[in-house]
Amino acid sequence: MSESWQPTLTEIALVFSRLADRVAEQEQIVLDPYVEQALRDALFHLELQIPGWEPAFDADAARAMRKASQESLDRGNEREAFGRALRGLSFAPHDPGLFYLLGSACFESGSVELALRVLCHTLWINPGHGGARADLEALSAFLDDSDDQQRAA
């Protein structure tokens, strides 16, 4: 149960739904700063909730959106994958698979910092998520390599 100042899981799901609408309306591949900040805020508030405490609002719809998001990523349409993952999160706000796809779409669209946050959130929900762990380790190794090369120059 959340404190009175904290949004409920239903309110967080509504945020994901509205963000999905906003992303669907835009033509640009680069994420809108408003969407990025709203997503950061939603992640913060979700981490104050207990994953699995409340059931998904519509697990079947979330599963369908997860599949649609993966197909969009496979086709190279990051914006569509991002929007579909957000729509899926409006049905299941603690779904690690949807967060993983959201993080992948963030990375593919150039929002590396947000991708790192979302992948970390995926691991917060499910520490055994293999894809998120592997991607996070690869990103960390790449970023560590970049820092070493910049220092050498």
Predicted regions and their residues:
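Register position in tetratricopeptide repeats
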Residues: 74, 108, 141-145
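TPR-adjacent "capping" and linker segments in tetratricopeptide-repeat scaffold/adaptor proteins
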Residues: 3, 47-64, 87-90
